[in-house]
């Protein structure tokens, strides 16, 4: 064939290595080749496997998952220093499981804090398992004292804002005169009464304006929202905290004052440590004018406090119809879409395109398998991946109604410190079972 060759002796090993495509450094006798041959030999494409680590936190990736062909995919929600993320998918697609895995794995970071606003108690087992606090906001045992710190002028200003937002919700026009009346009353009771008497009943008894008295009476022990009239606050924080909101969601008028108070208290514990705030069923937050404005403000400033907000909802419409849609879209650099076979329908396709997806990406979401596949996209890249969870992980993040009943039984019959032992017996796993 007219080929010239040389029988290698001293460089035999290097000659063989140089025949392996892409291994060009071992060839001491490099010959010119045309670009066609070069393209066939050069490793110019590969499956995107995600960032090797979380560069913002200088720590390992958040999650190691599996993608096409069992290739490793490293999931990180941070894009540079922005960790705000949105997770969207229809019911039964694995939303709660993924949120719990994000929460569980985020604990690997030094001094990490996790705060979950849950619906359906899907994160209760995980919260109890890691020794966190679980607050059921619809439980009669929950009590708040929002005026407890008004002896501090900054706290007094917040209390004024909180009370005025409640007036607006109750269709009371807030005039400068009303603000002055509330402020002077807050100042009076702050300088007159001890901390345990700084309650809603005290401020109502100190007011003279009938409109204010009748409106704020709802927040007292004799009103509909008596949880705000405690003389001692039951709210406390740990590094892993879950607030169950399902019952609260059924009382729409109390959602805003409750969440505004909790988020105000939450600001006190955000100290720059890596933190995430997970908002499950985020439509509740986006649908409320007072709270949506708070989220608009938070998304812009929490990044500087090393806090990531994760929105999760079952409906794209809830997000796109929100008056802060563009704020959420711009702030959430990472987006995770759950499998949705109806994604290719014309109405849904328009909604997905409003999130910046193209036809091919929408088709991937439509063809994905529910409860198994998730589609991540950001400016860094896109990847369909599978959490590929083992039995041990699923024992804590894959929770159903029967599991909730068993949890109630364990908490009733055993001390809290024995919860993990009893739960693992029930699930047939142990601390060393990672299969």
Regions found by a protein language model. Name each.
Residues 6-7, 114-116, 133-136, 308-312, ...:
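Short hydrophobic alpha-helical runs that function as membrane-insertion/retention elements
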Residues 87:
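Hydrophobic anchor at the beta1->P-loop junction of P-loop NTPases
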Residues 97-119, 280, 409-435:
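A short, charged
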Residues 4, 17, 21-73, 79, ...:
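P-loop NTPase motor domains
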Residues 93-146:
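Walker A/P-loop NTP-binding active-site region of P-loop NTPases
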Residues 12, 18-49, 90-91, 316-435:
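C-terminal regions of RecA-like/P-loop NTPase motor modules
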Residues 10, 119-120, 139-140, 282, ...:
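Short, ordered loop/turn segments at secondary-structure junctions
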Residues 1-15:
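Conserved ASCE P-loop ATPase motor domains encompassing nucleic-acid-directed helicases/translocases
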